[in-house]
């Protein structure tokens, strides 16, 4: 989990304060961040949305976006560690370039008027995000501490998979298949109502970065998944674009919440179709 937030960065709810803060940025950065579709601005937007959903409270969780529609699709913007996600600003992102994960920009480089000398730390999720980008060519990767994600892993203690079938919301998720020719996992459509959604569950570790090996193993072993659950911790979800990742995350959380209620009432998560 991220460390407590001690920073005094600007309140993102105040548009006036945000506009005033822009004057401390270089003209180049001012131009970048004036675009509402810039990945850094989208991270801020999603962080506030996810905070309202109780997915990234208490500085927990993280979001990263690869600039797939920009001039350099290898650029990845990552929210820092230990900041209140609902108050984050676009200039507080770390910028990394794939495939070598070269650090191009940190929020510690921006004028102190914007940070009040707060020392930003890279997200502990960074190596896990990088795994999703390299292994699945993702356009965005989301990590939340959703209570639904945590609870379902508790209910499935000792199990390595979450499975659910015959639920309409499953159709919001992609159908993926490993292509032997390209050696890549490719989207071939969407899951159908009668399909079984399978999400691997990995065990938590004391430090986030120590999850990297088990996350990579799950990604290799489950080519059909767009997410990995971390027991007693949360979930990682990725998609080909930021908006697809958002949709997948929302759909999965809906299914997790429903699955918890189904378990509580004794309804099997996977429908028996043999009778």
Swiss-Prot record:
Binding site for Zn(2+): 143, 145, 233
Main location: cytoplasm
UniProt keyword terms in alphabetical order: Amino-acid biosynthesis, Cytoplasm, Lyase, Metal-binding, Methionine biosynthesis, Zinc
Domain of life: Eukaryota
EC category name: lyase
CC annotations in GO: cytoplasm
Cofactor(s) annotated in UniProt: Zn(2+)
Coiled-coil annotated spans: none
Residue positions binding substrate: 125
GO MF annotation terms: methylthioribulose 1-phosphate dehydratase activity; zinc ion binding
Known EC number: 4.2.1.109
Catalytic residues (positions): 168 (proton donor/acceptor)
Role summary: Catalyzes the dehydration of methylthioribulose-1-phosphate (MTRu-1-P) into 2,3-diketo-5-methylthiopentyl-1-phosphate (DK-MTP-1-P).
Family to which this protein belongs: Belongs to the aldolase class II family. MtnB subfamily.
The protein, known as: Methylthioribulose-1-phosphate dehydratase
Species annotation: Lodderomyces elongisporus (strain ATCC 11503 / CBS 2605 / JCM 1781 / NBRC 1676 / NRRL YB-4239)
Gene name for this UniProt entry: MDE1
């Amino acid at each position: 989990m991220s460390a407590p937030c001690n920073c005094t960065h600007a309140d993102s709810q105040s548009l006036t304060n945000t506009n005033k803060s822009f004057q401390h940025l270089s003209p180049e950065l001012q131009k970048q961040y004036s675009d509402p579709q810039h990945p850094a601005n989208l991270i801020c937007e999603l962080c506030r949305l996810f905070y309202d959903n109780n997915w990234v409270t208490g500085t927990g969780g993280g979001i990263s976006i690869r600039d797939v529609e920009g001039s350099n699709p290898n650029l990845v913007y990552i929210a820092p560690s230990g900041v209140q996600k609902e108050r984050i600003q676009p200039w507080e992102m770390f910028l990394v370039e794939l495939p070598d994960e070269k650090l191009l920009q940190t929020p510690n480089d921006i004028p102190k008027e914007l940070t009040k000398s707060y020392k930003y730390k890279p997200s502990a999720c960074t190596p896990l995000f990088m795994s999703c980008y390299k292994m699945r060519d993702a356009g965005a990767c989301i990590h939340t501490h959703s209570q639904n994600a945590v609870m379902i892993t508790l209910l499935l203690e000792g199990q390595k998979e979450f499975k659910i079938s015959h639920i309409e919301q499953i159709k919001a998720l992609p159908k993926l298949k490993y292509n032997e020719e390209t050696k890549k996992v490719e989207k071939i459509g969407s899951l159908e109502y009668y399909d079984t959604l399978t999400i691997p569950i990995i065990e938590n570790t004391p430090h986030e970065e120590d999850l990297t090996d088990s996350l990579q193993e799950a990604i290799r072993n489950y080519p059909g998944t767009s997410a990995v659950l971390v027991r007693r911790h949360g979930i990682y979800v990725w998609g080909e674009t930021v908006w697809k990742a958002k949709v997948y995350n929302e759909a999965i959380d809906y299914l997790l919440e429903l699955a918890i209620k189904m378990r509580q009432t004794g309804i099997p998560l996977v429908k028996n179709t043999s009778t």
